[in-house]
Amino acid sequence: MDEAALEPTLVQTLAVSTAKGGRYLSLSPSFQRCSLASWIKENIKKKECCFYVEDGREGICKCGYPKVQHCDEAIKPEDYMGEQWDKHRHVRETPTDAFGDISFGGLGQKTGKYVRVSSDTSCENLYQLMTEQWKLRSPNLLISVTGGAKNFYIKTHLKDKFRRGLIKVAQTTGAWILTGGTHAGVMKHVGMAVRDYTLSSGSMEGQIVVIGVAPWGVIHNRSTLIHPEGRFPAYYSLDEQGQGRLSCLDINHTHFLLVDDGTQGHYGVEIELRARLEKLISKLSLGNRESGVTIPVVCVVLDGGPGTLNTIYNSMLNHTPCVVLEGSGRLADVIAHVASVPVSKVTMALINRLLKRFFMQEYKNFTELQIIEWTKKIQDILRMPHLLTVFRIDEDKNYDVDVAILQALLKASRSDEHAGRHCWERQLELAVAWNRVDIAESEIFTEESQWTSSDLHPAMFSALVGDKPEFVRLLLENGVCVREFLEREETLCELYSHLPSCFFLRKLAKRVQGGKMRRGQEPLPGSRKVCLSHVSEEVRHLLGSFTQPLYIASRYKPTKDDVRLKVPSKGALDLPCSGEEWSADTVWDPGRDLFLWAVVQNNRELAEIGWEQCRDCIAAALAASKILRKLAQESGEDDSEEATEMLELANHYEKQAIGVFSECHSWDAQRAQKLLIRISPSWGRSTCLWLALEAHDKSFIAHSGVQALLTQIWCGELSVDNPHWKVLLCMIFFPLIYTGFLTFRRDEDIQRQAERTEQQKLAMESVFAGQSDGKIKRHLRGFSQKSELKPLNCSSRLMSFLKSPQVKFYWNIASYFGFLWLFAVVLMIDFQTSPSWRELLLYVWLTSLVCEEIRQLYHDFDGSGFRRKAKMYIKDLWNILDVLSIVLFIAGLICRLQASDTVFYIGKVILCIDFIIFCLRLMAIFSISRTLGPKIIIVRRMMLDLFFFMFLLSIWVVAYGVAKQGILIENEERLNWIIRGAVYEPYITIFGNFPTNIDNTLFDISSCSVNASDPLKPKCPMLNADNTPVFPEWLTIMMLCVYLLFANILLLNLLIAIFNYTFQEVQDNTDTIWKFQRYELIKEYHSRPALPPPFILLSHLILFIRGVFLRDLPQRHKNFRQELEQTEEEELLSWEAYMKDNYLASTRQDESQSVEHRIHDTAEKVGAMSELLEREQEMVSATMAKRLARLEEQVSESAKALRWIIDALKSQGCKSKVQPPLMRSKSSDRDDGDSSGQETDDEEAPHMFARQLQYPDSTVRRFPVPEEKVSWEVNFSPYQPPVYNQQDSSESDTSALDKHRNPGGRTGIRGKGALNTLGPNHILHPIFTRWRDAEHKVLEFLAVWEDAEKRWALLGGPAQPDEPLAQVLERILGKKLNEKTKTLLKAGEEVYKGYVDDSRNTDNAWVETSIITLHCDKNTPLMADLNHMVESSLSSHQPLQWREVSSDACRCSYQREALRQIAHHHNTYF
């Protein structure tokens, strides 16, 4: 099968991930109910009686239902007249009429789902109902809880442990709990455990699934559940008082399967269906994967009676492990007391005493035959110790029931026939599925198991995909190598295909299908392939185009086997990968791949583990911050909650980067600064500094170590310790730089090197002490020549001084002030019709500024490309001001050069406004100042707030202005006066310029124009006959008061509050914000030419000539990007990793010393101490009760002995007719289960397989034969075995059977059974052996698989007593092989001959065998034929296989003994 076909698709991942979060496709509830009802009616049936026959009670049928509940056909049947009532014939199936949601009411409004099902319902349909219709996730474990169906007492401590452990194992493993479903006995305890968990958790997420399988005919108030179309919901009331012999459903179960066999009042009708359902689930693959690991099933037993014993017995025969809780009562205590006793000591007398002790009043109902059967079944149970686990609270083990359950499953798994590496891998996969790290640490990763990294890869993949970070960490601690795990490209592709539902997954799906998917649209059926080029393109989009793709074509080249994703297309289309040739400098870092996979899904714990595996940890943390902030920005509209979580995780990794960098900076500042500017091949050849700037990690940039680097870059080759006044003085009189007045960094390096050289010289002198002075001088001279630094010459000092960004900045400040001074002079003094020399100089100056802006636009500082550079340029506010000022200047210049006086004046006005913008540009220059810079940031923030305030204010201004203008003035047509009256006057009113035209007392007709004829006067308001205004004076004054109340008081105070909030917000972080924005200015002046405007034109001319004609553009400076040699790179990263480990260790230590951690630790210790004292008290009480019971029994026996002595004395020396009582020995005391040690039988039990209760391939049950009654010499009067012959036989009469008696003893059945003849039935086993290797270290034998017994066995066949050996071998092996084995027969040796414990044996027929060993050489023709026979048998139901001769190779005792003798004969290990 094509590998790609097995790989999961993205749409499946989306569906599963959504299901994990409890989200399903949004369908209306009515549609879901209709769909459920339709499916149930089609697939689920109920049973009803179709033949009414009274059972002796009036109006009651044999089925238990009253006559009124029978249909007319059942009351008057025509087909069954005269027949006896038979449940199998007179009960029919019809569509069920009881299903839906069940509501129990009360506190919390508990609800569940229920359905009435026929007892013959297909288990496949039931499982489909639960998983597809009820939307239950497939279980990772099935816990079948069985025991007492009636209420019973259980100790408080044991009850708490059971409830806590059951919920814990179900919660952590994702298990289903299966019970009887009624509100009584053990089912009630399970329900109470679920209730306690629900109340404590307070949420429906991670709901425990508890499925009750109850008989429909015994449910009280079941009529409320019946409706042909289903009830949504059905209101069910718990009525324990009126239930009588019936039972109520438990209100704390989540789902109910109500099994209907057509009868009423009969318990146990659900047992068969429940067993079939458990068997079906146990055969399903764990996690719906084809890994060969099936869903494990465990049986938990509390209390219990005869029905529970049958359940345990049958479960263990089906290889289901059982956990018995000692102290829960009755059957559970009986089994617990004999669990540590040898089977040979478990007698009928012991079982009789235990039943009397634990069943008390119920013991009277036990018959002798029942005690015999109980003894036999308990003996068989004890013979399967790998499937039996007893949980005792009085043992010195402080763990709950959950650990006992999981340990029982692992113990059963270890005893599997396929033990070995496969067994360990299965156990590990189970532990991963259960998410139980504690079990894996204690039971799997032990000294017995040796794991390689490749062995743990499947578990690692499951843990990563299943979001189990603790398991991932455990696997890494136990040898998983991330490099080996991610070595194959397909592994990483599969990880991305298994991403849970997240924003990145939707973006990736959109990219795979070419961007045609709309927002919110889920991928639809159809398939395209995903390869790491898709991931690389998406990650590059998130990181920024300044980075290179993370996955190069040579490392991860997409192939035809790439993982498939579902996209909406009609067929399978191959999406070609990007054809871009990626840089070969990009390296493969598996830790980075794992970290990146966890980050994009916003998984904090897995990302933390991946980050710890990264080589370049600071760059990784900063890159994660950038990716997460970008994802949060893009997903904000879709999922604000997810965006918030992403921002929190981004802040976390910014803190991690700060922490590691602080650790590095405290140890070595120079190496730490080198980490900031080194090019990181793992992260797209970016730098830590640039990643932090792109991610807007202000706190990281504000770190003292980063600021020290920026200050160093700012000063250039000058020392950072130079005072500003020295720099300014040298700018005025530059020859001072040659006098030592100004310190250069080279001078400081020389001084430091001289100090180090002096120290090393002293060390070398001490090393070469005693040698000649000439030799010491030669060593010192050679050392000095290797490490000597030369001081800067005069020209280098001058160029270094001029190229310093700090000096450039000061020159540009002076130049800009000169420009503004010249601009102001021209505008105010020298703005003539013909341009003067000052104005011409201004134009030249502006030209230099324009050229510099063009250079900045095209200067690709980080190599990200012109498009990105242009976008960044436009986004900068200061660049916008620069462009605006230049455009306005050009516009003003064009108008100024016109001949028209009007246009000339307009040009001057434009230039004056432009001067304002140039002055505002000064704020950017002074942002470098530590004092003014933060204030400029505050002003910028307040300007943004002012825009929002003006929007609110404009509403009131326009509202009041239009209303006032309309009231006062009639039909004003002059636009300028309309705007003045409706906008301007209301606006200036806010600042205290109150209008006079709204008050009649201040009205002056001379101040206005009546007909609006005077353009310089406003129009008069409407006048009456005496030339006074007619508007209502009270209204305009009231409007003014209300307007001033809202505009002048409310809104202005709101503006003050907004400004105050902005000031406080920025002021708290003003230093951080200033340090972050300081970088932009440093970067600008670092790349700026040395000459200030207007002399900068010379620099621009040189750059133009070099770029256009010489094609020799200057390289980007190494102060911001530095490529390290490979050796230096490895050393630096190793040092960084060491610093990271120090930081993480200190962080963990700080957390452990925190107050919260100490309080939590103290609370845990107090709880453990309280539990220990409580358990100790219960242990003392239980021990005391046992001692008192034993003392009472011994006193009673002593009294009997004394009575016998008295009777003997009375007889005057004659023997007393009364036998002396037998005193109990220590061994009998131990029979009561007080033995603490686990004992085993010294010898094998007599034919154990021949006494199995169920005879193979039949419905016949043997008579139970306890071990003590096996021997024919022992009297067993109740023994009445059935007679069974699979084939008709005339030898079934008693006389013929008595002629043959099984030498092994009683078997519980008479006749031939499935054997051919009475008496011995002979079988011959030829054992072919060979050496696996040339060193003769491993001996192998030819084995055959017995499908019925599910085990490997020896090759063999039937033989007649007097039949020649060659003839038997010919029938077993064939004629060809038989001819080639004749020579081996001479050297063959008979290693065993005698009785065989076979499950087909009876009292009168049994199996005897003869085993012969035949050793083959590896290069003989016979060996070739045998190997061919093995290969050809693989497809048959009885395959052959060469297996190692070992103690676990065969299960049968006689075959195991034969293999032991063969191993001893060949001197090899067994």
Curated annotation (Swiss-Prot):
ADP-D-ribose 2 binds at residues 1398, 1400. It is a multi-pass membrane protein. GO terms for biological process: calcium ion transmembrane transport; protein homotetramerization. Changing residue 930 to A: Decreases in sensitivity to PIP2. PANTHER family: TRANSIENT RECEPTOR POTENTIAL CATION CHANNEL SUBFAMILY M MEMBER 2, TRANSIENT RECEPTOR POTENTIAL CATION CHANNEL, SUBFAMILY M, MEMBER 6. Nonselective, voltage-independent cation channel that mediates Ca(2+) influx, leading to increased cytoplasmic Ca(2+) levels. Functions as a ligand-gated ion channel, gated by intracellular adenosine diphosphate ribose (ADP-ribose), Ca(2+), warm temperature, and oxidative stress. Binding of ADP-ribose to the cytoplasmic N-terminal region causes a conformation change; the channel is primed but still requires Ca(2+) binding to trigger channel opening. This is Transient receptor potential cation channel subfamily M member 2. It comes from Danio rerio (Zebrafish). The gene is trpm2.
